[in-house]
Amino acid sequence: MGNTTTKFRKALINGDENLACQIYENNPQLKESLDPNISYGEPYQHNTPLHYAARHGMNRILGTFLFGRDGNPNKRNVHNETSMHLLCMGPQIMISEGTLHPRLARPVEDDFRRADCLQMILQWKGAKLDQGEYERAAIDAVDNKKNTPLHYAAASGMKACVELLVKHGGDLFAENENRDTPCDCAEKQQHKDLALSLESQMVFSRDPEAEEIEAEYAALDKREPYEGLRPQDLRRLKDMLIVETADMLQAPLFTAEALLRAHDWDREKLLEAWMSNPENCCQRSGVQMPTPPPSGYNAWDTLPSPRTPRTTRSSVTSPDEISLSPGDLDTSLCDICMCSISVFEDPVDMPCGHDFCRGCWEAFLNLKIQEGEAHNIFCPAYECFQLVPVDVIESVVSKEMDKRYLQFDIKAFVENNPAIKWCPTAGCERAVRLTKQGSNPSGSDTLSFPLLRAPAVDCGKGHLFCWECLGEAHEPCDCQTWKNWLQKITEMKPEELVGVSEAYEDAANCLWLLTNSKPCANCKSPIQKNEGCNHMQCAKCKYDFCWICLEEWKKHSSSTGGYYRCTRYEVIQHVEEQSKEMTVEAEKKHKRFQELDRFMHYYTRYKNHEHSYQLEQRLLKTAKEKMEQLSRALKETEGGCPDTTFIEDAVHVLLKTRRILKCSYPYGFFLEPKSTKKEIFELMQTDLEMVTEDLAQKVNRPYLRTPRHKIIRAACLVQQKRQEFLASVARGVAPADSPDAPRRSFAGGTWDWEYLGFASPEYRRRHRQQRRRGDVHSLLSNPTDLDEPSESTFDLPEGSSGRRPGASVVSSASMSVLHSSSLRDYSPASRSANQDSLQALSSLDEDDPNILLAIQLSLQESGLDMDEETRDFLSNETSLGAIGSSLPSRLDSVPRSTESPRAALSSSELLELGDSLMRLGADSDPFSTDTLSSRPLSETRSDFCPSSSDLDSAGQDPSANDNLLGNIMAWFHDMNPQSIALIPPAATTEISAEPQLPCIRDGSEGVRDMELVPPEDSVSKDTGVHEGERAQMEENPLEENILAREELSQAGDSSNEAVGRGDRPDAASQTPQTSSDWLEQVHSV
């Protein structure tokens, strides 16, 4: 039994199918006990009988194992190979693994046998899986080298097996560990026909997204901003332009051509001149004013014909010429040769009416055409500036001369047309028309991007040149930049700068050593000090020296003048001079090598792209051959003729982009270093390089391994990136959708302070200087400063006030609160102290945010009375905390009880409060006792004293009515304890109750206060109005902000009117003028 099994195994290993079949058929016990899925062990690389049967292509034994003994072709050996891997290995691959059967020397027969075996493996069905399907042979199984059966079949050149694998869904794009596809494996083994067949199937493979990508490719606008024109295209373009212009002006073709030639073939320019003065336009062009045709006719019906009989003389003919050719004679004389013109001779009709014989006409026209003046041939009559029509020239000269005339005419058309230029390549008869000059603001056109100053154009034969200088194409560089780059290459001689990078690194290291280290005084080794004293010891030569003066340390003792003798100025200066010279020399060397290294960086990449461009130019020749080969190979397999022009299109896109990348490095070299413009340019340049290299890898290969739709998508992406790159350079390296620059300050510019929420520095500086000079009257008499729209207000439309909405109301409310607080704490004895404090406060800089916050917090904590409208507005304003402090950005409203709501003011309004403090401290007349005693007690009580009901309804805490200035100075003392020493404390002196003072009551601290309160009926009326408005606000919450602002404006106006009505004539007569003026100024603020 064991002997039979051993013989059978040896027959399988040696590939002797006849012996193996004889042993297997003659031993029933072996047939029953043999399992084709059991490994032979490690000595045999864990191959199974099925592996050996597939390796040698034993179709009879393989069929028996698969369908009779439940063999599994997915079993793997030690190399992770299945039976299909070994089956697809040809004789060339298996030579090194053992002896081969003699029939394997015949590869054709072996190919068919292996194809039959492969067909059996592909038809095999295993156990039933969970999904209801049966196990199949893994057609894309990979071994340890990541090879699939298709890799081995392609490398072996087994065409039948390759076709079977591809038909059953073998992966054409699978890559092994060497990143080779089955096509690459066939190419390496010189199976060219098989490689070409695999390439065609790879390129034209079907993919779900292929149709969508090809549809986008077909719809892609492939137009360029230029158009190459052949000679026939030039003639057609000229004729179309003449016909369209003649039809538009209702003029003959000859007249339209003359008009266009006189206006540089620019139809828009001609129409502009025609609309201004048609007669002058025709006179300057050398033609007569055309007669408008009758209705129902066009310009073609008005063309003169040489066969029509001559009409009467034109009115432009001179009297002398009329006398020389009288109309009553049957024959006329030629004005050149003075011979009679035969009646049998075909007449030459001219619009001017001059007669010449046909011989003179031919001689004259031949001479003009030979001289090259084909586009400005005037009538040969004396002082006649009538152009000779084209039909006259064609009817007189010979055919050869007519052909030459047409060439000169086309040449004149191109040279006089600024939008058309000839190709500068020698022997090229083509021209280029720049079809897109400038950008389209609408942005609907895909070619609406702006053109560069020196765009590159192509005549259609692959001749690229610059539109401006007619030299080598160099976009995105302009002509001057390109010239500077070529001059830079000539000066630098980069072929001699081979070791610049190494020299630059050496110079940089030398500069670093000189800057951060000192040489040892003995062995000159660089030493860097990072800790310790000035006593240094060289780690190399053990030399002790001083770090300061670099001399021996034994010189630093008490006997030599002290340890720190070297710290004297003379010694240090001497050492620094020596090191400074070395550092300056190293810096110069480093800077020079740095510039050289920078040039070599750009020059190296410039040459790399140039070399790649030269290599990829060869693809233009091979692309057509590749297209024919792919088309022929696919036609043999599928019978169709596919579109292969995408290969040539992709090569053209690659070459255009490669040329732009080559010239982009000179452009970047001359950009300003470390600028935003250069950073954006380099980012876009890198992005363009990435997509370009990706397309080059797909196209620049002997055999294409990328599907058609992926090549098309890569080419479209490169074209899109190229257009975006050029458009950005033409715009100055800025994205197309860049937003407007924010309102910020640049070098030499100014901030828009109101936009940022601050008062302008000019506004603050002017008020600070006035307060420091003590010019309080100029502050009081200059109310326009508060209303300047250019500095402290927003720009509002016409018809609205110049200041910000609600600013006047807030200022008025703040002033009234401030003045009432000052009136409570006022006393004659403390007036001078308060004035001194205010003058000291004015010496501080209100630009300091601490001052502004102090005033705001004082308003928040003072607990002063304010009406409901002002309370609602102040509670909704933005706090100064939003400008950088720790306060909240918006103050929450607080119920009106023992604590007043917080008032949030802007910086400009806080400055107005400071101005009011100065006015209150500097003006002493309104608070004189004579002024207060001159008014009756009843009037003063009605104007200044609140009723008991008002005080109870207010619910104020007596402790909240502190001095405003005291709160400011106390808070500022906590923030700046040193600066507050300059400010004298405010003295609080009690005053005795006198009968002439109005409504004096005792406070909680013994200080007598007085308040300005409106009459009771007005208070109750206003309270009712505010309650009704609050109820309406709750019903309409969306309109609360708008209504509040409108009511605040009306309340400000009504308060001014109430003040005006409160000044009765009798009171004004009894009060001095200074008091009334002061009160009016207080209320106006």
Curated annotation (Swiss-Prot):
Lipid-substituted positions (N-myristoyl glycine): G2
Keywords noted in UniProt: ANK repeat, Coiled coil, Lipoprotein, Metal-binding, Myristate, Phosphoprotein, Repeat, Transferase, Ubl conjugation pathway, Zinc, Zinc-finger
Domain UIM: 846-865
Placement of ANK repeats on the sequence: 45-75, 145-174
Positions of post-translational Phosphoserine modification: S738, S879, S906
Residues that bind Zn(2+) 3: C466, C469, H474, C479
InterPro entries per UniProt: Ankyrin_rpt, Ankyrin_rpt-contain_sf, Ariadne, E3_UB_ligase_RBR, IBR_dom, Rcat_RBR_ANKIB1, RING-HC_RBR_ANKIB1, TRIAD_supradom
Region: TRIAD supradomain, residue numbers: 330-570
Polar residues bias spans: 926-959, 1068-1085
GO molecular function, one term: ubiquitin-protein transferase activity
Binding site for Zn(2+) 4: C520, C523, C538, C541
SMART domains: ANK, IBR, RING
Recorded catalytic activity of this chain's protein: [E2 ubiquitin-conjugating enzyme]-S-ubiquitinyl-L-cysteine + [acceptor protein]-L-lysine = [E2 ubiquitin-conjugating enzyme]-L-cysteine + [acceptor protein]-N(6)-ubiquitinyl-L-lysine
Ligand binding (Zn(2+) 2): C352, H354, C379, C384
Zinc finger feature spans (IBR-type): 402-479
Pfam families listed in its UniProt record: Ank, Ank_2, Ariadne, IBR, IBR_1
Family: Belongs to the RBR family.
Protein name, entry field: Ankyrin repeat and IBR domain-containing protein 1
Organism: Mus musculus (Mouse)
Name of the gene: Ankib1
